[in-house]
Amino acid sequence: MTTLVLDNGAYNAKIGYSHENVSVIPNCQFRSKTARLKTFTANQIDEIKDPSGLFYILPFQKGYLVNWDVQRQVWDYLFGKEMYQVDFLDTNIIITEPYFNFTSIQESMNEILFEEYQFQAVLRVNAGALSAHRYFRDNPSELCCIIVDSGYSFTHIVPYCRSKKKKEAIIRINVGGKLLTNHLKEIISYRQLHVMDETHVINQVKEDVCYVSQDFYRDMDIAKLKGEENTVMIDYVLPDFSTIKKGFCKPREEMVLSGKYKSGEQILRLANERFAVPEILFNPSDIGIQEMGIPEAIVYSIQNLPEEMQPHFFKNIVLTGGNSLFPGFRDRVYSEVRCLTPTDYDVSVVLPENPITYAWEGGKLISENDDFEDMVVTREDYEENGHSVCEEKFDI
């Protein structure tokens, strides 16, 4: 019996058999301006000749799976002959779902996995639980950790003790990668070029040039300087999808600091946008979202827990999710949490080598556990007892 592990994120699906490597694939469908009638699914995005004005059709809205038609088509593609050629009669699945997921969504997922695809056994679990499992496996002496999962739709902060989540201390911040990309689109559209339709391109810009400032006001001052002294400023060459397929940053020595470029390249000049956008993760109130930033929320979450456990959480803070890849993210989280924490506590912030696939790797480890059979719901169980058996088994 093989096990398929699917970390079903709102932006990317991380998928692979437990005995193989993981693939990271867009969990959505696309339509392009040029081929209006054709819908591209998942990694077929690579086939689109001109991805400007790319239109996204997402199965998730505000972090919850609501568009089942799209999700089904993406899964059909992933499980089908193009990708994983799943033999449902001989396959179990570990699949992730968001925290505090709605019962109606859980029931739909049970029905689709058991009745339509007919997997032999299912384990439905939060991505954070998989990350915690991986962390405890790497650090067997630790009993507690706090998982910071900063993804596409939100950032969740979840303490785990002996692999059980502490529900009373879970915090959600409504800031994720989608909001950052949208904010960057608005700033660039207001200041330079109209890019409101260019989600795909601007998302790439964000990933290529943005970083987390260690000293916001100092970087702001540098960004105001003229010419050579402005070390923050960068010129980004936008793709034209004929000669330049993917945007890139101009090397510092090739930048024309005054006047125009001779070549016909389309250039975005970015200065304070580079760090002002990720800053929203630390100060959501900058754009009118009245919520705590990540470091403050970590401390607040830990302070909701029994005092004797708190030191164990402060020294096991684990960062996962795509936003933790911003340069400087880990250092900033560490320095701010350190400032907010009593001096007699140790603080340690861990950024795994690949924070995007960390939860998937946890799922792979769980599938190899001796007690894996006790965690799943088998198809016989489901056919006999329906949704109630899933509710009892899965601690969501």
Curated annotation (Swiss-Prot):
Q: Name one GO molecular function term.
A: nucleosome binding
Q: State the UniProt keywords alphabetically.
A: Acetylation, Activator, Cytoplasm, Cytoskeleton, Nucleus, Repressor, Transcription, Transcription regulation
* Regions annotated as coiled coil: none
Residues modified to N-acetylthreonine? 2
Provide GO CC annotations from the record.
cytoplasm; cytoskeleton; nucleolus; nucleosome; nucleus; Swr1 complex
Q: Which InterPro entries match?
A: Actin (IPR004000), ATPase_NBD (IPR043129)
- Location, primary (coarse class): cytoplasm
Can you tell me where the transmembrane regions are? none
Q: Which GO terms describe its biological process?
A: chromatin remodeling; negative regulation of transcription by RNA polymerase I; nucleolus organization; positive regulation of transcription by RNA polymerase I; regulation of DNA-templated transcription
Top-level division of the source organism's lineage: Eukaryota
Keyword Transcription part of the UniProt annotation: yes
SMART domains, A to Z: ACTIN (SM00268)
Tell me the Gene3D superfamilies matching this sequence. 3.30.420.40, Actin, Chain A, domain 2 (2.30.36.70), Actin, Chain A, domain 4 (3.90.640.10)
Q: Which CDD domains match?
A: ASKHA_NBD_Arp6
* Pfam families to which the protein is assigned, alphabetical: Actin
Q: How does it assemble?
A: Component of the chromatin-remodeling SRCAP complex composed of at least SRCAP, DMAP1, RUVBL1, RUVBL2, ACTL6A, YEATS4, ACTR6 and ZNHIT1. Interacts with CBX1, CBX3 and CBX5.
What protein name applies here?
Actin-related protein 6
Source organism of this protein record: Homo sapiens (Human)
Point out the gene that encodes the protein: ACTR6
